């Protein structure tokens, strides 16, 4: 688990750079301005959480369930949030919007919020 978390963080980071470049160059002509902004939001959130996963992976000892749950929230939440945005944007650009992905984005966002809340709780619990 200790090496898996920074590995996933690095993978998410690498994919964020690839998707960001793809969006900025290849999709700029295909996407509307709103679709491009949505796609960029997915890329930004993916990169933020990729960096966070690398940092947590090297700083957590994974001796508690709380640390494990925090990391799972960020891994799963990032995947659901960002990749559902990519799917929505790409499908809409092709004229076939995958409506099933619509509810997945806020679920991913909620899981990210839970991860941040658990991380905050872990800091407060250490102080108290």
Where are these regions (language model features)?
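Transmembrane alpha-helical segments of integral membrane proteins
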Residues: 79-95
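Juxtamembrane boundary at the C-terminal end of a transmembrane helix
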Residues: 117-128
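Hydrophobic transmembrane alpha-helical segments in integral membrane proteins
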Residues: 1-14
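Hydrophobic transmembrane helix segments
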Residues: 19-31
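Core segments of alpha-helical transmembrane spans in multipass integral membrane proteins
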Residues: 11-21, 37-62, 75-83
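Individual transmembrane alpha-helices with interfacial aromatic-anchor signatures
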Residues: 99-113
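Juxtamembrane loop-transmembrane helix junctions in multi-pass integral membrane proteins
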Residues: 1-4, 31-40, 59-69, 93-103
């Amino acid at each position: 688990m200790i090496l898996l978390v920074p590995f996933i963080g690095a993978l998410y980071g690498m994919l964020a750079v690839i998707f960001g470049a793809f969006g900025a160059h290849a999709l700029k002509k295909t996407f509307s301005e709103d679709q491009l902004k949505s796609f960029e939001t997915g890329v930004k959130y993916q990169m933020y959480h990729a960096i966070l996963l690398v940092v947590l992976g090297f700083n957590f000892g994974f001796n508690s369930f709380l640390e494990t749950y925090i990391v799972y929230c960020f891994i799963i939440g990032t995947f659901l949030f960002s990749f559902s945005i990519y799917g929505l944007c790409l499908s809409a650009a092709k004229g076939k919007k995958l409506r099933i992905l619509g509810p997945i984005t806020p679920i991913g966002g909620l899981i990210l919020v839970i991860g941040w809340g658990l991380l905050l709780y872990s800091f407060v619990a250490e102080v108290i």
